[in-house]
Amino acid sequence: NFKGKIIHPGTDCEMDEDGYGVSKKIASDWIVKSGSNTKIIKTSIIGPELHSRVSLLEWFLYQTGEVEGYTKAIWNGVTTLEWAKQCKNIINNWEVTPTLTILYSNNISKFNLLLTIQECCQKSDVIVIPKELGKDKSLKGNVRVKDIKEQIIELFKFYKK
């Protein structure tokens, strides 16, 4: 009989109708109904990677020249540092935390998100070109965190230590 506590990472991909999105939705629904020792943090994250450069942040940091930023791809996720802070908060307040926590920050287009990252890390070797593409993948949340620009500044400061 398992007595441990688990924080399950949810995702904005539950909106997708592919196998991954459907499986994440099924898992999330089951945990909400039956997972007494589990909390879900649903959000979308950006942050550094250890071994690849496929996520938005790492991909962008290694680009030069022109890159496209999608003006219709709306996002309101959090940095990995903010996600970790929220995990700590849930652990410290387990009994009063709802099973499902949906983190959200300000809505921002991927175009403006790239410009924000560029500004925060003073990246001058890339030009972000707006492209009208994408869809709204913002989440309706129940825990508002600080604006993404503040989070990105904190993230870069944290990793410069």
Language-model region placement:
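Amphipathic alpha-helical segment in the mid-to-C-terminal domain
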Residues: 80, 110, 144-148
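Short aromatic-enriched loop/helix-cap "lid" or pocket-rim segments at secondary-structure transitions
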Residues: 50-55, 113-115, 139-140
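Mid/C-terminal beta-alpha module of Rossmann-like enzyme folds, strongest
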Residues: 84-136
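Helix C-cap/helix->beta junction micro-motif
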Residues: 2, 34-35, 121
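Conserved Rossmann-fold NAD(P)-dependent oxidoreductase catalytic core, especially the SDR/UDP-sugar
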Residues: 1-21
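C-terminal amphipathic/interface module of NAD(P)-dependent oxidoreductases
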Residues: 122-161
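NAD(P)-dependent short-chain dehydrogenase/reductase
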Residues: 19-21, 25, 29-77, 82, ...
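Structural signature of the Rossmann-like NAD(P)-dependent dehydrogenase/reductase core
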Residues: 5-10, 39-42, 102
